[in-house]
Structures are given as C-alpha cells and as structure tokens.
C-alpha cells in the first residue's frame, strides 16, 4: 500500500511509474479512495469477520454504494490517512488514480477493470471531507528510512525507487524517467534531481 509521489503533478507521477506498478497501484488507490468514502460518509457497524473469529468494524452506507465501493482496508495506513485528511489530498490522489488508468491503457492497450468499475463512482469526493488545502505528502517508507527526505516526498520516492525497486522496468511504451537513467543501484540522493 503506497502512493508513489514521483512528481508533484499526479499525471506526471503516473507516467514515471515503472510498468509493474501501474496495474498494482490502480487497485491500491481504488482501495484507499473507497476506504476514505466509507470512513468519512459511512456508518461504522461492528460485526463478526467472515471467519467468525473476531469482531470487526465495517462501514456501511445503507444504500447501493455498499455494493459499489470496495470494503474499507488499511484504514490507518499513512497513505489512506493522508488521502482522508483534505479535499485537495483526495482530489490529488483521485487524479493520480485516473492518470495511472490512462497510463495502463497507453502501455497495455486496454482499460483496467478496477478503473472501469470504480473510476466514475469515486470521482466525487466524500461529503464529509475537510477543505483545508493540500497537505504535505506522506512518505510511507519507514522500512527504508535512508530514502526519506524531510519536506521532499518527490525526492524520497525517487530514492525509494532506486533503493527498493531494482526490478523497475519501462518496456511497455514509456521510457524510464530521466532521474532513473544512469542509476547504478548504489546512490541515494538527498536533493531533488
């Protein structure tokens, strides 16, 4: 679960993502955006898990939306929390989701099923979301603290790609971003490229 903020512009960030991340992150973004809708506009209901072993909190709308949105997952993940924090954060994340779906269509020649199902539904932000402006992007990479750059999520996520994503390839019609080219696998940068 993450939002790869490889650029401050959500479309450019999507264009810079490696081939493997495009289909995967469309699903993760849809999960986070759906979760934000459920948590902010839904009603919490406690009931047994599917296994029956635990009591869990579910969020219901009490209408057709219960069948449309994904179930709430990773409610307290930093990226989900960031998305729920403000209208502008939600909108940035939604436009990134749309941009990833466009990238998928560009690179693979077909529409991603998750976007087909949820794209129009999650376009409207939650009713109960705060309008406080775009907040600082979260850096969800605590397992790679050497990649983090205080106040610069873009550089941090580029560092993270370099350090943790050596598998990254751009073979489906998009060239690797300039900040990736020439990367040897050893360096992690502290300033924006």
Regions found by a protein language model. Give the residues of each.
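Sequence termini and other peripheral, non-core segments
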Residues: 1-72, 76, 80-193
């Amino acid at each position: 679960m993450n939002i790869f903020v490889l650029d401050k512009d959500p479309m450019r960030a999507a264009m810079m993502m490696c081939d493997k991340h495009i289909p995967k992150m469309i699903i993760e973004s849809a999960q986070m955006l759906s979760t934000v809708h459920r948590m902010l506009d839904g009603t919490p209901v406690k009931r047994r898990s599917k296994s029956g072993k635990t009591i869990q909190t579910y969020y219901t709308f009490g209408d057709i939306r219960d069948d449309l949105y994904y179930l709430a997952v990773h409610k307290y993940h930093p990226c989900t929390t960031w998305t729920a924090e403000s209208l502008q954060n939600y909108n940035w994340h939604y436009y990134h989701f749309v941009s990833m779906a466009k990238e998928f269509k560009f690179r693979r020649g077909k529409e991603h099923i998750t976007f087909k199902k949820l794209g129009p539904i999650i376009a409207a932000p939650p009713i109960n979301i705060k309008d406080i402006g775009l907040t600082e992007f979260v850096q969800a990479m605590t397992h790679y603290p050497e990649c983090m750059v205080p106040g610069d999520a873009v550089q941090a996520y580029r560092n993270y790609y370099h350090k943790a994503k050596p598998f990254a390839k751009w073979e489906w019609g998009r060239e690797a971003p300039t900040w990736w080219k020439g990367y040897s696998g050893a360096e992690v940068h502290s300033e924006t490229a």
